[in-house]
Protein backbone atom coordinates (compact mmCIF):
# COMPACT_ATOMS: atom_id res chain seq x y z
CA UNK A 1 0.00 0.00 0.00
CA UNK A 2 1.03 3.62 -0.39
CA UNK A 3 1.44 6.01 2.52
CA UNK A 4 -0.93 8.39 0.72
CA UNK A 5 -3.65 5.70 0.72
CA UNK A 6 -3.31 5.17 4.45
CA UNK A 7 -3.42 8.90 5.16
CA UNK A 8 -6.52 9.29 2.99
CA UNK A 9 -8.25 6.37 4.72
CA UNK A 10 -7.40 7.72 8.18
CA UNK A 11 -8.63 11.20 7.24
CA UNK A 12 -11.94 9.96 5.85
CA UNK A 13 -12.54 7.59 8.76
CA UNK A 14 -11.80 10.36 11.25
CA UNK A 15 -14.34 12.65 9.56
CA UNK A 16 -17.02 9.97 9.21
CA UNK A 17 -16.57 8.46 12.68
CA UNK A 18 -15.77 11.56 14.73
CA UNK A 19 -17.06 14.47 12.68
CA UNK A 20 -20.00 16.81 13.28
CA UNK A 21 -22.94 17.09 10.87
CA UNK A 22 -24.40 20.45 9.82
CA UNK A 23 -27.67 18.94 8.58
CA UNK A 24 -29.73 21.09 10.97
CA UNK A 25 -28.00 24.33 9.95
CA UNK A 26 -28.51 26.69 6.99
CA UNK A 27 -25.62 26.25 4.53
CA UNK A 28 -24.33 28.16 1.50
CA UNK A 29 -23.24 25.23 -0.74
CA UNK A 30 -25.89 23.49 -2.80
CA UNK A 31 -26.21 20.77 -5.39
CA UNK A 32 -27.05 21.51 -9.02
CA UNK A 33 -30.69 20.59 -8.34
CA UNK A 34 -30.85 23.32 -5.68
CA UNK A 35 -30.80 20.99 -2.68
CA UNK A 36 -28.65 22.25 0.22
CA UNK A 37 -25.32 20.39 0.35
CA UNK A 38 -24.76 19.38 3.97
CA UNK A 39 -21.53 17.94 5.36
CA UNK A 40 -19.87 15.98 8.12
CA UNK A 41 -16.80 17.95 9.19
CA UNK A 42 -13.70 17.76 11.36
CA UNK A 43 -11.76 20.78 12.54
CA UNK A 44 -8.05 20.99 11.77
CA UNK A 45 -6.81 17.92 9.96
CA UNK A 46 -3.00 17.89 9.64
CA UNK A 47 -1.32 15.39 7.30
CA UNK A 48 2.41 15.01 6.61
CA UNK A 49 3.97 13.53 3.47
CA UNK A 50 7.68 12.79 3.06
CA UNK A 51 8.22 13.51 -0.63
CA UNK A 52 11.70 12.03 -0.50
CA UNK A 53 10.18 8.60 0.15
CA UNK A 54 7.18 8.41 -2.16
CA UNK A 55 4.97 10.50 -4.41
CA UNK A 56 1.68 11.02 -2.52
CA UNK A 57 -0.97 10.00 -5.02
CA UNK A 58 -3.66 7.59 -3.85
CA UNK A 59 -4.35 4.26 -5.57
CA UNK A 60 -7.78 3.71 -3.96
CA UNK A 61 -9.14 5.58 -6.96
CA UNK A 62 -7.62 7.53 -9.80
CA UNK A 63 -6.42 11.08 -9.23
CA UNK A 64 -6.18 12.90 -12.56
CA UNK A 65 -2.43 13.55 -12.41
CA UNK A 66 -2.03 15.63 -15.58
CA UNK A 67 -5.16 17.71 -14.96
CA UNK A 68 -4.03 18.46 -11.41
CA UNK A 69 -0.67 19.68 -12.71
CA UNK A 70 -2.36 21.74 -15.43
CA UNK A 71 -4.37 23.56 -12.76
CA UNK A 72 -1.38 24.25 -10.50
CA UNK A 73 0.53 25.65 -13.51
CA UNK A 74 -2.52 27.78 -14.36
CA UNK A 75 -2.43 29.30 -10.89
CA UNK A 76 1.29 29.46 -10.07
CA UNK A 77 2.99 29.73 -13.46
CA UNK A 78 0.46 31.47 -15.70
CA UNK A 79 -0.95 33.38 -12.70
CA UNK A 80 -4.23 33.37 -14.57
CA UNK A 81 -7.77 33.95 -13.38
CA UNK A 82 -9.38 33.01 -16.70
CA UNK A 83 -10.68 29.49 -17.32
CA UNK A 84 -9.86 29.80 -21.03
CA UNK A 85 -6.20 29.36 -20.01
CA UNK A 86 -7.06 26.05 -18.32
CA UNK A 87 -7.38 22.75 -20.16
CA UNK A 88 -10.35 21.51 -18.13
CA UNK A 89 -13.81 22.68 -17.08
CA UNK A 90 -13.55 22.33 -13.30
CA UNK A 91 -13.76 26.09 -12.76
CA UNK A 92 -16.56 26.81 -15.21
CA UNK A 93 -19.23 27.10 -12.49
CA UNK A 94 -17.40 30.12 -11.02
CA UNK A 95 -16.50 31.87 -14.28
CA UNK A 96 -18.36 34.78 -15.83
CA UNK A 97 -19.16 35.20 -19.52
CA UNK A 98 -15.56 36.23 -20.26
CA UNK A 99 -14.10 33.22 -18.43
CA UNK A 100 -12.86 35.25 -15.46
CA UNK A 101 -13.13 34.04 -11.85
CA UNK A 102 -12.44 37.55 -10.59
CA UNK A 103 -9.42 38.64 -8.58
CA UNK A 104 -8.82 35.15 -7.23
CA UNK A 105 -6.05 32.55 -7.15
CA UNK A 106 -3.57 33.21 -9.96
CA UNK A 107 -4.47 36.89 -10.12
CA UNK A 108 -3.30 37.36 -6.52
CA UNK A 109 -0.02 35.52 -7.07
CA UNK A 110 0.72 37.88 -9.95
CA UNK A 111 0.26 41.11 -7.98
CA UNK A 112 3.63 42.82 -7.56
CA UNK A 113 4.99 44.38 -4.37
CA UNK A 114 8.09 46.46 -3.70
CA UNK A 115 10.92 45.02 -1.58
CA UNK A 116 14.42 46.31 -0.77
CA UNK A 117 15.74 44.00 -3.51
CA UNK A 118 13.25 45.21 -6.11
CA UNK A 119 9.72 44.54 -7.34
CA UNK A 120 8.40 40.97 -7.30
CA UNK A 121 5.10 39.16 -7.52
CA UNK A 122 4.53 36.43 -4.93
CA UNK A 123 5.85 33.54 -7.02
CA UNK A 124 8.96 35.37 -8.17
CA UNK A 125 9.68 36.44 -4.59
CA UNK A 126 9.62 32.79 -3.48
CA UNK A 127 11.93 31.80 -6.32
CA UNK A 128 14.30 34.67 -5.49
CA UNK A 129 14.47 33.79 -1.80
CA UNK A 130 14.96 30.06 -2.36
CA UNK A 131 18.07 30.86 -4.39
CA UNK A 132 19.36 33.90 -2.50
CA UNK A 133 17.97 33.63 1.05
CA UNK A 134 17.27 29.91 1.62
CA UNK A 135 17.62 30.25 5.41
CA UNK A 136 14.87 32.89 5.49
CA UNK A 137 11.80 32.19 7.62
CA UNK A 138 9.75 34.61 5.52
CA UNK A 139 9.30 32.58 2.34
CA UNK A 140 5.55 32.36 1.91
CA UNK A 141 2.58 33.27 -0.22
CA UNK A 142 -0.94 34.33 0.73
CA UNK A 143 -3.79 34.85 -1.72
CA UNK A 144 -6.54 35.57 0.82
CA UNK A 145 -6.54 39.30 0.10
CA UNK A 146 -9.38 40.83 2.11
CA UNK A 147 -9.62 44.01 0.06
CA UNK A 148 -10.26 41.97 -3.10
CA UNK A 149 -12.65 39.33 -1.70
CA UNK A 150 -15.67 41.19 -3.04
CA UNK A 151 -14.25 40.78 -6.55
CA UNK A 152 -13.54 37.04 -6.23
CA UNK A 153 -16.13 34.61 -7.58
CA UNK A 154 -14.91 32.05 -5.03
CA UNK A 155 -12.87 32.80 -1.92
CA UNK A 156 -9.57 30.88 -2.00
CA UNK A 157 -9.74 27.47 -0.31
CA UNK A 158 -6.02 26.66 -0.41
CA UNK A 159 -4.79 30.13 0.43
CA UNK A 160 -1.25 30.06 1.82
CA UNK A 161 2.04 28.23 1.23
CA UNK A 162 5.00 28.50 3.59
CA UNK A 163 8.36 27.27 2.29
CA UNK A 164 11.22 26.28 4.58
CA UNK A 165 14.68 25.04 3.66
CA UNK A 166 16.20 22.66 6.21
CA UNK A 167 19.66 21.46 5.29
CA UNK A 168 19.35 21.00 1.55
CA UNK A 169 15.68 19.99 1.64
CA UNK A 170 12.73 22.14 0.64
CA UNK A 171 9.68 21.67 2.85
CA UNK A 172 6.27 23.25 2.49
CA UNK A 173 3.10 23.85 4.49
CA UNK A 174 -0.19 24.33 2.65
CA UNK A 175 -2.89 26.07 4.69
CA UNK A 176 -6.41 25.42 3.50
CA UNK A 177 -9.50 26.97 5.08
CA UNK A 178 -11.94 24.42 3.63
CA UNK A 179 -11.78 21.17 1.68
CA UNK A 180 -14.24 18.84 -0.04
CA UNK A 181 -12.38 15.69 0.97
CA UNK A 182 -13.64 13.33 -1.73
CA UNK A 183 -13.10 15.58 -4.73
CA UNK A 184 -10.17 17.72 -3.63
CA UNK A 185 -8.05 16.11 -0.92
CA UNK A 186 -5.63 14.07 -2.96
CA UNK A 187 -5.99 16.46 -5.90
CA UNK A 188 -4.51 19.27 -3.79
CA UNK A 189 -1.87 17.00 -2.27
CA UNK A 190 -0.67 15.95 -5.73
CA UNK A 191 -0.62 19.56 -6.96
CA UNK A 192 1.45 20.97 -4.14
CA UNK A 193 3.76 17.96 -4.05
CA UNK A 194 4.53 18.65 -7.71
CA UNK A 195 4.96 22.36 -6.95
CA UNK A 196 7.54 21.54 -4.27
CA UNK A 197 9.37 19.25 -6.69
CA UNK A 198 9.47 22.05 -9.28
CA UNK A 199 10.67 24.72 -6.84
CA UNK A 200 13.28 22.37 -5.39
CA UNK A 201 14.70 21.46 -8.78
CA UNK A 202 15.05 25.02 -10.08
CA UNK A 203 16.56 26.12 -6.74
CA UNK A 204 19.16 23.35 -6.53
CA UNK A 205 17.44 21.70 -3.56
CA UNK A 206 16.04 18.28 -2.68
CA UNK A 207 12.40 17.74 -1.75
CA UNK A 208 11.54 17.20 1.89
CA UNK A 209 8.19 17.22 3.68
CA UNK A 210 4.83 18.48 2.52
CA UNK A 211 2.50 19.33 5.40
CA UNK A 212 -1.20 19.85 4.66
CA UNK A 213 -3.26 21.79 7.21
CA UNK A 214 -7.03 21.82 6.62
CA UNK A 215 -9.17 23.97 8.91
CA UNK A 216 -12.55 22.53 7.86
CA UNK A 217 -12.20 19.05 6.34
CA UNK A 218 -15.60 17.78 5.29
CA UNK A 219 -17.44 15.09 3.38
CA UNK A 220 -20.68 16.06 1.66
CA UNK A 221 -23.86 14.09 2.37
CA UNK A 222 -24.16 12.71 -1.18
CA UNK A 223 -20.49 11.67 -1.10
CA UNK A 224 -20.68 9.47 2.00
CA UNK A 225 -21.68 6.21 0.22
CA UNK A 226 -18.98 6.77 -2.42
CA UNK A 227 -16.32 7.39 0.22
CA UNK A 228 -17.33 4.26 2.13
CA UNK A 229 -16.99 2.25 -1.08
CA UNK A 230 -13.60 3.74 -1.97
CA UNK A 231 -12.20 2.97 1.47
CA UNK A 232 -12.80 -0.74 0.78
CA UNK A 233 -10.88 -0.72 -2.50
CA UNK A 234 -7.56 -2.56 -2.85
CA UNK A 235 -4.39 -0.57 -2.24
CA UNK A 236 -1.37 -0.67 -4.52
CA UNK A 237 2.25 0.46 -4.15
CA UNK A 238 2.90 4.13 -4.86
CA UNK A 239 3.90 4.85 -8.47
CA UNK A 240 7.26 6.32 -9.44
CA UNK A 241 7.25 10.08 -10.05
CA UNK A 242 9.32 11.32 -13.00
CA UNK A 243 10.13 14.95 -13.80
CA UNK A 244 12.21 16.41 -16.62
CA UNK A 245 15.56 17.07 -14.93
CA UNK A 246 16.69 19.38 -17.73
CA UNK A 247 14.27 22.15 -16.76
CA UNK A 248 16.07 24.85 -14.75
CA UNK A 249 13.54 27.68 -15.04
CA UNK A 250 10.20 27.38 -13.26
CA UNK A 251 8.40 29.06 -16.16
CA UNK A 252 9.67 26.48 -18.64
CA UNK A 253 7.80 23.55 -17.08
CA UNK A 254 4.90 22.08 -19.03
CA UNK A 255 2.48 19.28 -18.19
CA UNK A 256 4.48 17.00 -20.48
CA UNK A 257 7.51 17.27 -18.16
CA UNK A 258 5.83 15.00 -15.58
CA UNK A 259 5.07 11.29 -15.64
CA UNK A 260 3.96 8.52 -13.31
CA UNK A 261 5.31 5.03 -13.84
CA UNK A 262 3.31 1.98 -12.72
CA UNK A 263 0.30 3.93 -11.47
CA UNK A 264 -2.24 1.29 -10.47
CA UNK A 265 -5.67 2.26 -9.15
CA UNK A 266 -9.26 1.07 -8.89
CA UNK A 267 -11.57 2.68 -11.42
CA UNK A 268 -14.46 4.59 -9.86
CA UNK A 269 -17.67 3.83 -11.73
CA UNK A 270 -19.88 6.40 -10.00
CA UNK A 271 -20.07 10.02 -11.10
CA UNK A 272 -19.13 12.44 -8.32
CA UNK A 273 -21.35 15.49 -7.94
CA UNK A 274 -19.64 18.73 -6.99
CA UNK A 275 -21.33 21.09 -4.55
CA UNK A 276 -21.22 24.76 -5.53
Predicted regions and their residues:
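Terminal, non-catalytic protein-protein interaction segments that mediate quaternary/complex assembly
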Residues: 1-276
